Amino acid sequence: MENIAPALLEWFYKNQRILPFRTDPSPYHVWLSEIMLQQTRVSAALPYYERFLAALPDIPALAACEEEKLHKLWEGLGYYSRVRNLQKAARIVCEQYGGQLPADYDALRALPGIGDYTAGAIASISFELAVPAVDGNVLRVFSRLYNDPGVITEPAVKRAFTARVMEHQPPEKAGDYNQALMELGALVCVPNGAPLCEQCPLASLCEARRAGTALELPHKAAPKARRIEPVTVVLAEDAEERFLLQQRPQKGLLAGLWQPLLWEGEALSAEEVCARLEALGLACEGIEPLPAAKHIFSHIEWRMSGYSVCVGSAEAPTGCVWASREQLQNEYTLPGAFKAYKKKLGL
């Protein structure tokens, strides 16, 4: 196959989206944008990106940020392990590299939360190093370009695709080339629905287009079944209109975040909820059920039963705090898993 870079780059320079991390592709900006975009659409991530940079304009500021403020800045993006790893990496960068990301692929790859793709994106876009940056968009483009039925989630197949990506990469324009492939996958060689082949600069070279197989590609491994878990959520409110929050363990699902009272693995009745509250030293003065809800994590699906409970004034149990509606809005971060109950909390 002839080299795709000339046609691809010509298309990219004419059609690329104007994005703040392209206008200023400094290492910190590219890093932050790539972490945010791992599980979030560009349009949804941009307001968070701007707000985050306004609050934490450089790596030392990120490294020094208090945990609750950091979580609040990330609130709404979900997958909070991303921002925890971001801060861990920032602290290492401050300790080992003087607060500046290293211009070295392997050193970037060694930082928490930075995998092959993110290291490649930073190294090629910010430091102009000739390395690959292969994400799902790029794998889809090359799967169709070569009409390759390989399962792209398999490491050996991904390595083979990466080698093909590098065969076409112009070393002097590695960052633009990598971004152009990602942009082509995001805007033209799209994942859902028919690819927009009539807009594609590589259409004349695309083997899947000729074979009529573009809609069938790429091939992925079948996803693992999620575990269904019953959960009981309790919005306990005292006479001062404060809600009881508990902090999750520092490791595991939603690590370190705040949540309403929660019992995992159990769908409790109203009587059982009152008994549990009384065991915590909280008098149950009134209880009403809330609509059932569910939340899907990557490997678990919570089926939530909810209750709104009025309780007598008391000290917060160990690991819990009382929070006013104002504090809930400005200080504490509740994960999106509790979206169905946030209106009741005044959020």
Identify the function of each model-found stretch.
Residues 1-18, 23, 186-347:
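Intrinsically disordered, low-complexity, charged terminal extensions of DNA damage-control enzymes
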Residues 2-198, 202-211, 215, 283, ...:
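Catalytic cores of DNA base-excision repair glycosylases
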